[in-house]
A protein has these predicted regions:
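Active-site helix of classical SDR
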Residues: 16, 130, 167, 175
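Conserved mid-core segment of classical short-chain dehydrogenase/reductases
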Residues: 76, 98-116, 160-163, 203-207, ...
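Catalytic Tyr-X3-Lys loop
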Residues: 90, 108-127, 147, 171, ...
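C-terminal helical subdomain
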Residues: 191, 211-243, 250-252, 277-281
Length: 281
């Protein structure tokens, strides 16, 4: 029965940022394997050929669309593909986003250009895609589910991530507002906030360091793209039919970890001899 609730047969789901070889590509694959027709969106035709075309060759119902979700023309191209696809429009997954290494800097050094680019890449694409899909669902009188990929940087503060974190936090605020506005239309709106995840982009920017991850993350490792995709499928599916306006954090417990913790997740002050002596008094 639970497996049936995860099925998306006959439904169309749009995935933006689908061709980076990480979370978006994995979401595209998993949602297609759940039976959906996926409109896979990316600005890069080369990446679509590399990461999305093989999914279609496996018999999955995946339609690649080269479009920029930040632009009016790009959103229009996506919706044209939706209207030409077989099935009923149902879902959207906003994965497009990210932060260029130049934006990982102290707040005092973040340029106007970088801040604007961060909001365009992470917030505007999410807003305009959600707006278009929600309007289409309302016009058709259909229920649906919209899921956006935020970040733990948008949930808690993160040094050197002021612009990126602000954009992802704004996304969460928008998710809540849209959830309220669309609830009576049967359209649910939620977000997933990944923690450190092993993707091609993360390897490029911060490399692989299992020992660092073991110290920093309570579960001792980075997340896998399929673990983020699983959370997305849950929020798309009927298993979450009474959930809206929420952010599901998938981070291996890193948000639970107080900054003054030792490697074994115990408070550093417990290792202080004077403190231990005071506890015995």
């Amino acid at each position: 029965m639970e497996q049936d609730l995860l099925k998306l047969d006959g439904r169309i789901v749009v995935v933006s940022g689908a061709a980076g070889g990480g979370i978006g590509t994995t979401v595209t694959s998993l949602v297609a394997r759940a039976g959906a027709t996926v409109i896979a969106v990316s600005r890069s035709e080369a990446n679509l050929d590399r990461h999305v075309a093989p999914l279609a060759s496996q018999g999955l119902l995946v339609t690649p669309v080269a479009a920029d979700a930040q632009t009016e023309e790009g959103v229009a191209a996506v919706m044209k593909s939706v209207r030409g696809a077989k099935g009923e429009l149902y879902g959207l997954v906003n994965v497009a986003g990210g932060a260029a290494p130049s934006t990982w800097c102290p707040t005092t050094r973040l340029s106007r250009e970088d801040l604007r680019a961060l909001f365009a890449q992470n917030l505007e694409s999410m807003f305009f895609m959600s707006q278009a899909v929600a309007a289409e669902l309302k016009a058709q009188g259909r229920p649906g589910s919209l899921v956006s990929i935020s970040s733990i940087s948008g949930v808690n503060s993160a040094p050197y991530h002021s612009g990126y974190g602000a954009a992802k936090a704004a996304m969460l605020s928008m998710v809540k507002t849209m959830a309220l506005e669309l609830a009576l239309d049967g359209i649910r709106v939620n977000a997933v906030a990944p923690g450190p995840t092993a993707t091609p982009a993360s390897r490029t920017y911060v490399g692989d360091d299992p020992e660092r991850d073991r110290r920093a993350i309570p579960m001792g490792r980075r997340g896998r793209p399929e673990e983020i995709a699983g959370a997305v499928l849950f929020l798309l599916s009927n298993l979450s039919s009474y959930i809206t306006g929420q952010c599901l954090t998938v981070d291996g417990g890193i948000n639970l970890k107080w900054s003054h913790l030792a490697d074994d997740n115990t408070p550093l002050f417990l290792k202080d001899e004077n403190f231990r002596a005071a506890m015995k008094r």
